[in-house]
């Protein structure tokens, strides 16, 4: 089955109003795109921010008459009679197959591979983490996740205990266990992340070595030799004392989820507890590492 889509240029002040109107006029779905490559990094809790220049795509059935829709939109004062829009035919595809074809095994560091379950493992002798993309959690493709995986690959984790602070999909926790850690504790504020981490640990046969907690349930005396936190700069700053007290003296720390321009400030903040290393960058993102004093 083919489809037809209507693309409209608008701004963030009118995007939701326009979306509601398009749905009332028969659209089957609405998507938002950034019209000018303007990044949004850290929205406030409960906010769904949109770009100042937003492109709305409304999908309709192929035989739907869009002429009345366009005429109705021309009457809206925030668009005007000459509003920017485009109508395109969209061929139906096996979207699931196309989505799966876009994911390939990825190597991080020297030993570690992240592999989708439907792909053949490139190196059976390597440390292979089987992880399928799903939900809004890390799969290794984001620079911050990659930075943390590369750091873990470079450590001697044999027999050590680690903490994955903000575990998300559990990718870092599972990788640490596959790299030799004796035990990992994963902490996250989202119960969906706890479920995702558990499922991924089971898929990789390491669930018996992974303890998972919501913050309010974690042991009061929790400490480890290694802690990795791939969250955002704001929480990293606010939770610094809590994170620091979870790392044993001489233990190792890795922080990511922060932008290049945020790295120096966060590093200085943690320097009261850790001997901090120089930041490592990948694209616009940074990783900070240090050793507990």
Swiss-Prot record:
Biological source species: Shewanella loihica (strain ATCC BAA-1088 / PV-4)
Role, per record: Methylates ribosomal protein L11.
Keywords linked to the UniProt accession: Cytoplasm, Methyltransferase, S-adenosyl-L-methionine, Transferase
Protein known as: Ribosomal protein L11 methyltransferase
GO cellular component: cytosol
Catalytic activity: L-lysyl-[protein] + 3 S-adenosyl-L-methionine = N(6),N(6),N(6)-trimethyl-L-lysyl-[protein] + 3 S-adenosyl-L-homocysteine + 3 H(+)
Cited PANTHER family: ELECTRON TRANSFER FLAVOPROTEIN BETA SUBUNIT LYSINE METHYLTRANSFERASE
Database matches in Pfam families: PrmA
GO biological process: methylation
InterPro entries registered for this protein in UniProt: Ribosomal_L11_MeTrfase_PrmA, Ribosomal_PrmA_MeTrfase, SAM-dependent_MTases_sf
Positions with a binding annotation for S-adenosyl-L-methionine: 145, 166, 188, 230
């Amino acid at each position: 089955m083919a489809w037809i889509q209507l693309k409209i240029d608008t701004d963030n002040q009118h995007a939701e109003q326009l979306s509601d109107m398009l749905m009332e006029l028969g659209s089957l779905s609405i998507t938002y795109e950034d019209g000018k490559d303007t990044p949004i990094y850290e929205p406030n809790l409960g906010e769904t921010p949109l770009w100042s220049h937003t492109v709305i795509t409304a999908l309709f059935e192929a035989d739907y008459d869009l002429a009345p829709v366009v005429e109705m939109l021309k009457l809206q004062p925030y668009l005007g009679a000459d509003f920017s829009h485009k109508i395109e035919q969209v061929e139906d595809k096996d979207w699931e197959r196309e989505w799966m074809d876009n994911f390939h095994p990825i190597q991080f560091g020297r030993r570690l591979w992240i592999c989708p379950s439907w792909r053949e493992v490139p190196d059976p002798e390597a440390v292979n983490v089987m992880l399928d993309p799903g939900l809004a959690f890390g799969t290794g493709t984001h620079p911050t996740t990659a930075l943390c995986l590369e750091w873990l690959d470079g450590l001697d984790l044999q027999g050590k205990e680690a903490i994955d602070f903000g575990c998300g999909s559990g990718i870092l926790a599972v990788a640490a266990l596959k790299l030799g850690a004796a035990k990992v504790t994963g902490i996250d504020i989202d119960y969906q992340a706890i479920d995702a981490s558990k499922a991924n640990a089971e898929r990789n046969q390491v669930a018996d070595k992974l303890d998972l907690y919501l913050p309010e349930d974690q042991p009061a005396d929790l400490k480890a030799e290694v802690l990795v936190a791939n969250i955002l700069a704001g929480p990293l700053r606010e939770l610094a004392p809590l994170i620091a007290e979870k790392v044993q003296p001489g233990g190792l720390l890795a922080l990511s989820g922060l932008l290049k321009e945020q790295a120096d400030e966060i590093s200085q903040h943690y320097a009261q507890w850790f001997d901090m290393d120089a930041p490592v960058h990948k694209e616009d993102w940074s990783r900070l590492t240090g050793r507990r004093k």
